[in-house]
């Protein structure tokens, strides 16, 4: 359930964009009605409507995520606050300037923030964030923990670069598909490969 909860804004972004693509006139009318006051010039065109509506929904969904957790008196992870700040800034710029370039940078900025946090904590704070999250499930030598942490740094940097490559070398529709299925698929593959490599260190249930 937590996995689906975390993916909620991404899934809605994908669904609204696809709906907008298939219902261009309705999407343009809807965007003009609800977003015209937020865009520079006050006009939402047929070609712009799908990405602008999807971006607006992603911002709202992320705010609702945090609101739900706060209403249930649950802890809001720092990563979710970071995601909110980035989606509001880059998504807001996309809507105001009706320019999809900003929202296409959002995943890369988020990936690179994760990489920077992992690397900074290990080098300057002598704290391994991956170890903090995973040490209850497995016991690894210090050197292995460092390599696992650095492997995540490399993964996030690579994902950020890959996002930019797809975003600016393929159509927006292709990028939206990659954002959900490509990003999720590569994340799953990385986790599975890493889990297989580290399986010998898994703690036996008591």
Curated annotation (Swiss-Prot):
Name under which the protein is recorded: Inner membrane-spanning protein YciB
Chief location bin: membrane
Alphabetized Pfam families for the sequence: IspA
Function: Plays a role in cell envelope biogenesis, maintenance of cell envelope integrity and membrane homeostasis.
GO cellular component, as recorded: plasma membrane
UniProtKB keywords: Cell inner membrane, Cell membrane, Membrane, Transmembrane, Transmembrane helix
Membrane-spanning intervals of the chain: 50-70, 78-98, 105-125, 150-170, 173-193
PANTHER family, sorted: INNER MEMBRANE-SPANNING PROTEIN YCIB, INTRACELLULAR SEPTATION PROTEIN A-RELATED
Localization, UniProt: Cell inner membrane
Cited InterPro entries: YciB
Family of the protein in this entry: Belongs to the YciB family.
Gene that specifies this protein: yciB
Membrane topology (UniProt): Multi-pass membrane protein
């Amino acid at each position: 359930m937590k996995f689906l909860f975390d993916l909620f804004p991404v899934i809605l972004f994908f669904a609204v964009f696809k709906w907008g693509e298939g219902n261009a006139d309705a999407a343009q009318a809807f965007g003009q009605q609800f977003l015209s006051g937020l865009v520079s010039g006050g006009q939402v065109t047929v070609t712009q409507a799908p990405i602008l509506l999807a971006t607006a929904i992603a911002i709202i969904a992320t705010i609702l995520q945090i609101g739900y957790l706060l209403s249930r008196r649950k802890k809001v992870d720092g990563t979710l606050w970071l995601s909110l700040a980035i989606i509001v800034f880059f998504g807001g710029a996309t809507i105001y300037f009706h320019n999809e370039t900003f929202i296409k940078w959002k995943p890369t900025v988020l990936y690179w923030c994760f990489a920077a946090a992992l690397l900074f904590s290990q080098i300057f704070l002598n704290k391994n964030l991956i170890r903090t999250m995973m040490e209850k499930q497995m016991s690894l030598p210090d050197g292995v923990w460092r390599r696992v942490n650095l492997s995540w740094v490399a993964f996030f940097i690579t994902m950020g670069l890959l996002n930019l490559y797809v975003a600016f070398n393929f159509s927006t529709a292709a990028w939206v598909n990659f954002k959900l299925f490509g990003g999720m698929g590569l994340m799953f593959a990385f986790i599975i490969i890493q889990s297989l490599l580290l399986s010998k260190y898994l703690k036996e249930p008591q």
